[in-house]
Curated annotation (Swiss-Prot):
Keywords, comma-separated and alphabetical: Cytoplasm, GTP-binding, Initiation factor, Nucleotide-binding, Protein biosynthesis
Protein's UniProt name: Translation initiation factor IF-2
GO molecular function, one term: GTPase activity
Localization in the cell: Cytoplasm
Domain of life per record: Bacteria
Length: 883
């Protein structure tokens, strides 16, 4: 190292801060005034010895010092920039290259490479450890400095607040004292002398009568004005702070607030000592203001149920309703302040406004119901199987059940088809079996799906002469989706065109493989008319039921599913239910969807009244508050109150969900109307049917007829006869009333006749769909179509002083008529559309010219006809539009 090394340069070489190097030099006994002073070699040696002593190492011998003086180490640093490609952009990185070289004078012993490497590693490790310790010390020093700064700021703020509180308390105390003095000065000063030695009479327990409104307040006691040493509870309001002069202003303010705790916020009146309080509002409040402005945005956790109104959401967010409505408009949701919105929309707008939304559990009554239903635990016993008969329409499902039950249900059904689910239980030689008969018509898809979910075994009836049909394939899919085993009954084998093998091959294409073909599906050939093979079918059902090991709890509260429901004029709401667990008895309280009630009576399919219904037994229940939806679950509860609470809660949720959905669809209709310029044609319907399943099937089938030109809208549907309210709603909305196996009462007929409402009665679902199609087609109007009736080719063009350009033409196709519109085509491109001015043949006006005939054609208001053009004659016709 040269003799001209400065302290700053030395600090860079040894990688030490300049301040620390100055401290080390001062510790070694060398005083330097600045980092630019020169450090000699002897001073460096002295510093090295000091550092070695401070680290507990012996100083170097003179010969070692001489050897170290003969060796010099140079450190070189070079900085450069490197460009790095990172994806689509480029990043510039600063890179520092450090080089270190050691030079030894001649005569000094050169270190071996291993010794040099070890020495370098040792020095690097020591330097790294030293730097780490220094960095930790600096970080700790910075942390302590920051904490001291924060603490000083907090103390300063606290002192300032304390000073402000003391100042405010002092001002309020002075104001209170001044008010008390003014009050005392305004009262009469002459009083009768009071004998202090006489004993005071005891205070009466009863309150003194109130002074009249206009009377002046009683004068203060002279001893209260003069005696400053009296107890605090005997002093008047003027000397309230007299005994607190030695306290701080904050303590006086605190004590003043505690003394006013019994004032109850009313100006005037009496305090605890019987004196008058200050009449001004807040006159005795010596404490600081209670409100503090928040320093950060307040984030609230808002509990939101399935639906919530905009007003309730705004109240929970502590915002104005208009702000929430504005946020909804920005999100594309048009809602009013009283409108209900769903949970997802409410959660999105809550997050948009900077708060957190959590899902609220508003199913307290539902949870209590589930808890009570879960208490039904007992020993499971074997139960009868539930078998659903499915298949295509007119394949013999009901006839099969008629033979098993020895009844004639099929002959009494309208149109010879089943239009609702029938539930029966039959005592067979193989045991009790419960049967569900489902409709086969395409409109009753939901009924078939519901029957597949309730059943244990599906019997698929396929006609041997008809084969696999669309509803047959649909029944197979329902059975697969429900995970129910399948048994195929090939019916009508007694007919001449029966081919059971063809049926099996067609079922094979639907992945239904018979046992004869190596599969696992039992297929039985039967005849529902003669009874052939019925016993084999019952045997197959019994074997399948034994394999399933069907069990259920036969005691305790009952629960199950509604199969069908209707409204009987004499008996009220009637629900056909299938018990799945427990025992249903007369007098039980049950909840069924949004309906509830007490079981007044039970009826089986024969009309008898059983004492109870166990698992897998279908019965009719009377006593519900309304007609339940087909497919709803029912459960027996302890009391009517719980049943009513659960039903009302479900009804409220369903109504709110319906309102939310209606609002959304109404807004979509408005936007669609604005987009098209004119809205769709709408056909409003009011549907009333005898059973709930028929209502569902009709609603789904008729709404499915809607397209982009017309929309079928079911404004109301229900079970039972057509009532006065149904007629009024139909008249108000100009709807067509459809009665399916029901009739209108006298009052409804009067309204229908007076308002001209379209009323139609049906008993077969085919007729309903066909009639609605016709009515909807009438609303569509007609469509204008253009039909080309003739084409003439221009051969030459003549000029006429009266008509202008006349095209000598040959009719090459169809007929050209005089009073029909025409188009002029050139190179198969329409260049003009208008009408004929003249049509002549041999200089005579004619009405039409047929194929293969020459004629002269003058086009009105067009003279640019050229040879080779084609004149196309067409007519416009009206075609009725259909669905």
């Amino acid at each position: 190292m040269s003799q001209q090394t400065t302290i700053r340069k030395l600090a860079e070489l040894v990688n030490t801060p300049v301040e620390k190097l100055l401290e080390q030099l001062a510790g070694a006994g060398m005083k330097f005034s600045g980092p630019d002073q020169v450090v000699t070699s002897s001073e460096k040696v002295k510093l090295l010895g000091f550092l070695r002593r401070s680290h507990g190492k012996p100083e170097q011998a003179p010969e070692e010092t001489d050897q170290s003086a003969k060796k010099i180490t140079l450190n070189r640093r070079k900085q450069q920039e490197v460009t790095v490609n990172s994806g689509r952009s480029k990043t510039t990185v600063n890179v520092e290259v450090r080089q270190k070289r050691t030079y030894v004078k001649d005569g000094a012993r050169a270190m071996t490479p291993d010794e040099e490497r070890a020495d370098i590693l040792r020095k690097l490790e020591e330097s790294r450890a030293r730097n780490l310790a220094e960095q930790q010390a600096l970080a700790e020093k910075d942390r302590l400095r920051d904490e001291a700064i924060v603490r000083a700021r907090e103390e300063e703020v606290a002192a300032k607040e304390r000073a402000e509180a003391e100042k405010k308390a002092a001002e309020e105390a002075a104001a209170a004292a001044k008010a008390a003095e003014a009050l005392a000065a305004s009262k009469p000063k002459v009083r009768a002398p009071i004998d202090e030695t006489a004993p005071r009479p005891p205070r009466a327990p009863a309150a003194a009568p109130a002074a009249p409104r206009g009377a002046p307040p009683p004068p203060p006691r002279s001893d209260d004005r003069n005696n400053r040493s009296a107890p605090r509870n005997e002093r008047g309001p003027g000397d309230r702070f007299a005994g607190q002069m030695h306290l701080s202003a904050a303590d006086r303010a605190r004590r003043g607030n505690s003394n006013n705790s019994n004032n109850r916020g009313r100006p005037g009146g009496r305090n605890q000592s019987g004196g008058r309080r200050d009449m001004s509002r807040g006159g005795n409040n010596a404490g600081p203001h209670a409100f503090e402005r928040p320093t950060a945005p307040v984030v609230r956790e808002v509990a939101i149920g399935e639906t919530i109104t905009v007003a309730d959401l705004a109240q929970k967010l502590a915002l104005k309703g208009g702000e929430v409505v504005k946020a909804l408009f920005k999100m594309g949701v048009m809602a009013t302040i009283t409108q209900s919105i769903d949970h997802d929309t409410a959660a999105l707008v809550t997050e948009e406004l900077g708060h957190k939304a959590i899902r609220a559990n508003d199913n307290d009554a539902e949870d209590a119901l589930l808890a009570s239903a879960g208490e039904n635990q007992g020993e499971a016993v074997q139960r009868p199987p539930v078998v659903t008969i499915m298949g295509h329409v007119d394949h013999g499902k009901t006839s099969l059940l008629d033979y098993i039950r020895r009844t004639k249900v099929a002959t009494g059904e309208a149109g010879g088809i089943t239009q609702h689910i029938g539930a029966y239980h039959v005592d067979t030689p193989k045991g009790v079996i419960s049967f569900l008969d489902t409709p086969g018509h395409a409109a009753f898809t939901s009924m078939r799906a519901r029957g597949a979910k309730l059943t244990d075994i599906v019997v698929l009836v396929v006609a041997a002469d008809d084969g696999v049909m669309p509803q047959t394939k649909e029944a197979i899919q329902h059975a697969r989706s429900a995970g129910v085993p399948l048994i195929v009954a090939i019916n009508k084998i007694d007919k001449s065109g029966a081919d059971p093998m063809r049926v099996k091959n067609e079922l094979l294409s639907e992945q239904v493989v018979a046992e004869d073909f190596g599969g696992d599906i039992q297929m039985v050939e039967i005849s529902a008319k003669t009874g052939l093979g019925i016993d084999d079918l019952l045997d197959a059902v019994s074997v399948q039921a034994e394999l399933l090991e069907l069990k259920a709890v036969d005691e305790g509260r009952a629960n199950g599913v509604v199969i069908e429901s209707s409204l009987d004029k004499g008996r009220g709401p009637v629900a056909t239910v299938l018990v799945q667990q427990g025992r249903l008895k007369k007098g039980d309280y049950l909840v069924c969807g949004i309906q509830y009630g007490r079981v007044r009576a039970l009826f089986d399919e024969t009309g008898k009244q059983p004492e109870f219904a166990g698992p897998s037994i279908p019965v009719q229940v009377l006593g519900l508050s309304g007609v339940p939806e087909a497919g709803d679950d029912f459960v027996v509860v302890d009391d009517e109150r719980l049943a009513k609470d659960v039903a009302q809660q479900r009804e409220t949720k369903r109504r709110e969900s319906r309102l939310v959905a209606t609002a959304g669809s109404r807004m979509e209709d408005i936007m669609a109307t604005l987009g098209k310029g004119e809205g769709q044609q709408v056909l409003n319907l009011v549907i009333k049917a005898d059973v709930q399943g028929s209502v569902q099937a009709l609603s789904q089938a008729l709404v499915a007829l809607s397209n982009e030109d017309i929309r079928i809208n079911v404004i109301h549907s229900g079970v039972g006869g057509i009532t006065e309210s149904d007629a009024n709603s139909a008249a108000a909305s100009k709807a067509t009333v459809i009665g399916f196996n029901v009739r209108a009462d006298a009052s409804a007929r009067r309204i229908i006749e007076s308002n001209g409402v379209d009323l139609r009665y049906f008993s077969i679902i085919y007729d309903v769909i066909d009639q609605v199609k016709q009515v909807a087609s009438g609303l569509l109007g007609v469509e204008i179509r253009e039909e080309i009736i003739g084409i003439a080719e221009v051969r030459d063009v003549f000029r006429s002083s009266k008509l202008g350009a006349v095209a000598g033409s040959m009719v090459i196709e169809g007929v050209v008529k005089r009073n029909k519109p025409i188009r002029v085509l050139r190179d198969s491109v329409v260049i003009f559309e208008g009408e004929l001015e003249s049509l002549r043949r041999f200089k005579e006006n004619v009405e039409e010219v047929r194929n293969g005939t020459e004629c002269g054609i003058a086009v009105k208001a067009y003279n640019d006809v050229k040879p080779g053009d084609q004149i196309e004659c067409f007519e416009r016709i009206e075609v009725p539009r259909t669905l």
